[in-house]
Design a protein with these regions (language model features):
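N-terminal secretory signal peptides that target proteins for export/translocation
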Residues: 1-5, 40-43
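Bacterial N-terminal signal peptides that target proteins for export
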Residues: 2-11, 744
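A cross-kingdom C-terminal cell-surface attachment/processing module
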Residues: 20, 734-766
Length: 769
């Protein structure tokens, strides 16, 4: 009895000390052998390392999750599950992963007896079966949430509970509240894990990720088919070692990721910089994101001289590879280009440029002076001082500092002033200020469309400017007020930028320039998301906006068929989209769709070169127009001279001859169609002389069931906001353990858990004697 009493007292003391250590441990962080793929603040937890053959319990705590949904689909969201202690089942990792997006053993306690550590990070490690189950439809790898210190190559035995969770939650900083990602898949992981080292083992052979990649994400939301569905193919590799053969880079590093193609990729023709352009109904699933960290500098055409090996994970609604090696990129030699279009006396040159949240506020996180100079120099040296420059994303004078100001005159004039300082050329600026807070964009910034013009080359039609809510109208073919916004009170323009119409005169001829920044793609489904088929939820709004703008142009041409209309801007939609088709109708020519296919892009996002910026011209002058995108930004990082996230696009219109009669010919009608093939990397990058052609309407059918989830700058800015919201500080609350997607246990439950662990330890120790 004395011995039993002594043991009970020792157990109670151990329990108390363990509870106190649980709080004390929050003051320390242990960093594993390799850095994590997240830049988030780590959860603050210690661990106790042990020698080979010893056992250590993970400090993870598992409870019931908050979110419950139907489990009828293997692509569903997290379902509630219990983590009550049960006898573990010995399985291979492939059995845990299963032939589905979710584990068939979710919520169950399992034991893995013969695995090797393939990669570590601050929150746990990746393990893979030493002997595969031979089933290519199931992954042999898994992520283990644990602070137990292991090294790559350690042979381990693991006991833990199967969980479908989020890597964003695992890497969440201490004291921050987790917000479940919208439309995001989960990652199969082990939590509440016990780890036993058992010597070392060689790493399994990495799977060539390019070799088996399907060409699309199929629209069957329930069937699991990794042979033909890219989403399921990625799932079949989740947590496994993979390799990309000597990849080349497709675009600039963004948020720590680069997109690449392996040297063995043969699926599609490449564009003129070795990338893949978006095309109708093509998702470019072969592009592979690799995490490299946000200090890594890379641009399009750079390459790796050796294979890149890493494990597959999923976060922020897409799969990626986290390398297991130090990467060194080689310079591929891509240079920022200058426009081939040169100024000409009888030719009107118009540029469209998204200058990415530009204001007169020169604070570091607003528009610093070096950015002003970069953009001004791009006007001077890369696009050769156009006569008219339409500006997208001009903010009010204070930038994002919200003091109720809506005027952006100081912002526009600051850019004009910098151009004059650098080259001596004078530009004037015009705009119509929005209603405060009514046009979307960065909070407090009131972004709008603005126009710079050279008064020595063009004259602004002398009219009173419209107010924010006055709609642009024509009288005898001329704007009643100038400038004016198109249908500012139309519901399709709620909380987004209103198109700006400005009438100029060039060589005695009227030219109406309409600057546009249509509804962003924020809210569209991700290709690699829960919702399948993915849907472009924002497309109907852009289609409605396009219809309003087109009707406005129709009315102007009806009143004066000789007026030249030029529509410029960031349309937040592709050159082959139904939005572009509606805009063009029978009156306008879609210039980008006529351009060389291998050079047809102005933006880069998630692996694809794409068109968001475009110019449309009325058919009465289309045959006299030369168009080109000027690739100075989208493929580059700031370190290479990038001034914005968009490339400018440029049109030059020859007014030296007679204007084509106002009524378009059959060949000039409906020019939103285009060829979809791409050229080889040696394709010409010159400007394109345009001849309108009949629309290929069969390629322009509206489809909200097949999304090309390749969103633009505002989507990325929204991601920043969502990430900030995900990591909102919780006053007075501090998480001690890495989050596992379940409620933080109460203190009493924690004490019971520690007591139980102590008892287990005691029993095991007793059994060894």
């Amino acid at each position: 009895m004395r011995n039993n009493g002594k043991k009970i007292r020792l157990l109670a003391v151990a329990t108390l000390l363990a509870s106190q250590l649980g709080v004390f441990n929050s003051a320390f962080t242990v960093v594993a052998d390799e850095t994590t793929a997240s830049t988030s603040e780590p959860a603050l937890v210690t661990n106790t390392s042990s020698e080979d053959g010893s056992t250590n319990h993970s400090t993870s705590v598992t409870a019931t999750t908050e979110v419950t949904t139907s489990a009828s689909s293997d692509r569903g969201e997290i379902a509630s599950s219990s983590s009550e202690d049960t006898e573990e089942k010995t399985v291979k990792i492939g059995e845990i992963q299963g032939e589905a997006q979710r584990s068939p053993l979710e919520g169950q306690k399992v034991a893995i007896k013969n695995a090797v550590v393939t990669k570590t990070d601050r929150y746990g490690f990746y393990a893979q079966d030493i002997e595969s189950d031979g089933n290519s439809r199931t992954s042999d790898g898994i992520y283990v949430v644990s602070k137990y210190k292991v090294k790559v190559g350690d042979k381990v035995k693991i006991t833990g509970t199967v969980k479908e969770g989020y890597m964003e939650e695992v890497t969440l900083g201490a004291g921050k509240t987790f917000k479940e990602p919208t439309n995001s898949l989960t990652v199969t992981m082990l939590v509440d894990a016990w780890i036993t080292k058992d010597g070392t083992a060689p790493l399994p052979e990495a799977v060539n990720i390019t070799a088996g990649m399907p060409a699309e994400v199929k629209i069957n939301p329930t069937a699991y088919d990794p042979e033909t569905d890219a989403l399921d193919y990625w799932e079949s590799l989740e947590g496994m070692l993979t390799v990309v053969k000597k990849p080349h880079v497709l675009g600039p590093q963004y948020k720590g990721d680069i997109y690449v193609l392996g040297e063995d990729f043969t699926g599609l023709p490449l564009n003129n910089i070795g990338g893949l352009n978006l095309r109708p109904h093509a998702q470019n699933t072969a592009t592979i994101p690799i995490y490299v960290g946000n200090q890594f500098v890379a641009k399009a055409k750079d390459y790796f001289a050796e294979d890149v090996t890493g494990v597959v994970t999923y976060r922020n609604s897409f799969y990626k590879v986290e390398p297991t090696q130090q990467l060194t990129v080689q310079d591929g030699g891509l240079q920022r280009q200058a426009a081939q279009t040169q100024p000409s006396e009888d030719k009107l040159t118009i540029a469209s440029y998204n200058i990415e949240n530009f204001s007169a506020n020169n604070a570091k996180n607003e528009t610093p002076e070096d950015k002003v100079t970069l953009i001004a120099n791009s006007f001077i040296h890369e696009i050769h001082n156009p006569d008219i420059i339409t500006l997208i994303e001009v903010q009010d004078n204070n930038g994002s500092v919200d003091v109720g100001t809506t005027s952006g005159l100081e912002s526009g004039r600051k850019l004009a002033s910098r151009i004059k300082e650098l080259v001596g050329k004078s530009y004037e600026y015009t705009e119509v200020a929005p209603v405060d807070g009514a046009d979307g964009g960065k909070p407090g910034s009131n972004i709008r469309l603005g126009i710079l013009y050279n008064p020595e080359r063009v004259s602004l039609a002398k009219k009173e400017a419209a107010t924010s809510n006055e709609a642009a109208q024509f009288d005898k073919g001329h704007l009643v007020k100038n400038p004016a916004r198109i249908a500012p009170n139309d519901p399709s323009f709620d909380h987004t930028r209103k198109s700006l119409a400005v009438e100029f005169e060039f060589k005695g001829k009227p030219v109406v320039v309409i600057a546009n920044h249509l509804k962003s793609k924020i809210g569209d489904d991700a290709i690699y998301g829960v919702s399948q088929p993915a849907v472009e939820h924002t497309l109907p709004t852009r289609e409605a906006q396009a219809s309003v703008i087109h009707q406005f142009v129709q009315e102007g041409l009806k009143q004066n068929p000789k007026t030249t209309f030029v529509l410029t801007g960031d349309f937040n939609d592709y050159d082959f989209s139904t939005t572009a088709q509606i805009l063009a109708g029978n009156e306008l020519t879609n210039l980008m769709s006529q351009h060389d296919a291998g050079d047809r892009y102005s933006y880069f996002y998630r692996g694809s070169n794409q068109v968001l910026d475009n110019i449309f011209i009325s058919n009465n002058m289309a045959a006299k127009a030369t168009f080109e995108p000027v690739h100075i930004n989208a493929s580059f990082m700031k370190e290479h001279g990038r001034a914005s996230d968009h490339d400018p696009v440029l049109v030059q219109i020859d007014f030296s001859g007679a204007q084509i009669p106002g009524t378009p010919t059959d060949d000039q009608k409906g020019n939103s169609g285009q060829a979809t093939e791409q050229t080889s990397p040696s394709s010409s990058n010159t400007g394109t002389q345009l001849v309108p052609h009949q629309a290929q309407a069969n390629e322009q059918k509206s489809s909200t069931s097949k999304s090309l989830e390749t969103t633009k700058d505002e989507d990325e800015k929204q991601e920043d906001k969502e990430e900030a919201a995900t990591e909102t500080k919780t006053p007075g609350k501090r998480k001690i353990l890495p989050s596992t997607g379940q409620e933080t246990s109460y203190l009493a439950l924690f004490g019971v858990a520690v007591a139980t662990m102590s008892l287990v330890w005691y029993k095991k120790k007793r059994m060894t004697h």
